Regions:
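Extracytoplasmic metal-acquisition and chelation regions
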Residues: 12-14, 25-218
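Bacterial N-terminal signal peptides that target proteins for export
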Residues: 2-13
Length: 218
């Protein structure tokens, strides 16, 4: 039980660590128009928003968050304006089918071709690159209890889709997003990959700290 509480605390800490820079960025960018020359990236959740901001540092990229604060991702219903914005974007990044079930409905409604890279797979639809950031990640199974009832709007199935709370999985997500960004904007691919390498190094250091802390809790 102690280890479970510790793991939950660490997961919450990582979530806050990833979200705080994004929250600060939102405040700084309030009222600023998008850069017409920069690549446009739409992300679904705060962790992906933070990944995208870190990966595009040093460029004129326009990173936006689709879900308003406080909105439940599982039950979110994109408006027609949201769908149009996604179609006009250069990159659309989401966590995966178990987290944003509605994302596949949007994607399936569009004509596209499958493109692959050495490090992952992404979908190209015209000029739009779609990044499923759960690719390459084995989701953890959730132990079902007979006395538990599924909550409305939380259609996880038997898997935990909150993959960004694990630093190693977060690093994989960042790598997938990097390849999508590089495909959409080859001119800045070198910058994206350099930023990704630095970001993944920070996550690896964080993971090492987690492992050391967990070892001490045994």
């Amino acid at each position: 039980m102690q280890k479970k509480r510790l793991f939950q605390s660490l997961a919450l800490f990582l979530s806050l660590l990833l979200a705080l820079p994004a929250l600060a960025g939102c405040g700084d960018a309030a009222g600023e128009p998008p850069n017409a020359d920069g690549v446009t990236i739409i992300t679904t959740l705060f962790p992906l928003y933070d990944f995208a901001r870190a990966l595009t540092a040093g460029t004129d990229a326009n990173v936006s968050l689709l879900l308003p604060p406080g909105v439940e991702s599982h039950s979110f219903e994109p408006s027609p304006a949201d769908i149009i914005a996604i179609q006009k974007a250069d990159v659309f990044a989401y966590t995966g089918e178990y987290m944003e079930t509605w994302a596949h409905e949007i994607i399936d409604g569009l004509d596209g071709t499958q493109g692959t890279t050495e490090d992952g797979t992404f979908l190209t639809i015209g000029s739009l690159v779609v990044a499923d950031c759960s690719l390459g990640i084995q989701l953890d199974e959730i132990e079902a209890h007979a006395d538990e009832q599924p909550h409305e709007g939380h259609g996880h199935g038997n898997y935990d889709p909150h993959i960004w709370t694990d630093p190693t999985q977060a690093a994989t997500m960042a790598g997938t997003l990097t390849e999508a960004l590089s495909a959409a904007d080859p001119e800045h691919a070198e910058t994206y990959r350099a930023n990704c390498e630095a970001y993944q190094a920070e996550l690896a250091e964080l993971d090492a700290d987690f492992v050391a802390l967990m070892s001490g809790a045994k």
